[in-house]
Amino acid sequence: MKTILVVDDEFDILTVWRLLLERHGYAVRTASNGAAALELVRSSRPGIVVSDCMMPVMSGLQLCAALYEDPELRDIPIILCSAASDIPVQPNPHIAYARKPLSFDRLLAMLVRMGG
């Protein structure tokens, strides 16, 4: 079973995506900001990270940079989501970008494409 870490500061998004992903056979962990996500990744490496871009404490961009700086974590696939029309491109080749609002069907398709 593939483990997905969903990172978003909106509780409703965390709850809905967790429930839907679990119904599709995924194990799901959640975090409300990049700093909490980084702790979870270091304690239990997920198969894929799905992260919002703009969050308090540590943004999704900062999370992506921190993961890329760690040689043991840099190959974790990441789906970085944002309502903004332009997200600064990260040097990590394992990042896919998604525009919010992101439908669950599109999320599932992206997960499958990224090996989830």
Task: Give the ranges of each region predicted by the language model.
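Acidic catalytic/metal-coordinating carboxylates
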Residues: 32-36, 59-63
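Receiver (REC) domain active-site loop signature in two-component systems and cognate sites
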Residues: 55
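Active-site residues of response regulator receiver
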Residues: 8, 52
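Short hydrophobic/Thr-rich beta-strand motif most characteristic of the beta2 strand and flanking loop
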Residues: 25-32, 40
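C-terminal output helix
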Residues: 102-115
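Hydrophobic/aromatic residues positioned on beta-strands within the core alpha/beta folds
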Residues: 81-82
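Charged docking surfaces used in two-component/phosphorelay signaling
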Residues: 15-23
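Active-site beta3 strand of CheY-like receiver
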Residues: 44-50
